[in-house]
Amino acid sequence: TSQQLAGEKLAINTDQWDGYPVERQKFYKIITKSQANIVLAGDSHNSWFSNLYDDDKNFVGVEIGAPAISSPSLADSYGDFTDIIEKSFIEENDGLIWVNGSYKGYTSLAIHKDYIDVSYKYVSTVKSKDYLSLKPYTFRVEHNKPYT
């Protein structure tokens, strides 16, 4: 996400990709050349699933952002506004397909020759030994193809 000021893009957060546009494009060239089209991320403490595109709008891969298990997430900071924030992220980011800033858990991958099954697995609470496993969100990523 970036803002426009006098025709120039300004970084919103220099601790994420919009703060490193040159490096992002170099990274995209590396993963395109290697045909390693799955990018795993996790520092945001929220669940993300995105198609990645370079500056020329060419597909370069899929980003899988893993949730936090105990670190603060969107819901911890914004509570009831989390759904609104998630929707605005999707509206403002062309490649972003899905985001969940509410649940704690982990992401698992089942890797096959031509595709990867991605499963975001969550629990009802991390504040008690008594918890429920929630229904996972799942995606199938085909090799070198954007998710549709």
Regions found by a protein language model. Give the residues of each.
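Long, structured stretches of catalytic cores involved in phosphate-ester chemistry, encompassing
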Residues: 1-148
